[in-house]
Amino acid sequence: MPTLTVAELVLDRRSDELISLPASASVAEAAAVMAEREVGAVLVMTEDGLVAGIFSERDLLVRVVAGGLDPKATTLSLVMTRDVKFVTPGTSSEAALALMHLHRFRHLLVIDGPRVHGLVSMRDLVLQMIKSGEGRYESAVRQARP
């Protein structure tokens, strides 16, 4: 089986599909965008267009809800994950998953030089690996059905 990379997940995405919000956006705005676009995280950008961090469902749960903060009055800059880990398109899916596991992240930034290609999620990587299983996934699903 060939080595799978994150390139197959992000390089074919159009750059306008990159979901990002300014650091000044409210948590409520971010939650609405995430729900509408059915994603678990968004990039948070500075006024200069640089990546400031990532805001994820986990940030919403741990920092906002458990912290008793008002989502409408709390900006992303206060609750986003700042220590953003990244991979390049050539990173293997296994290496990306290992990095996520090691640092307890569910999303990684994918960059190639100065270009941001997007975010890759643990779910994206697992689905990619399942689909590449040459029919084993479909067989397992058939066997699991009553």
Give the residues covered by each predicted segment:
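Tandem CBS (Cystathionine beta-synthase) repeat/Bateman regulatory domains
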Residues: M1-P146
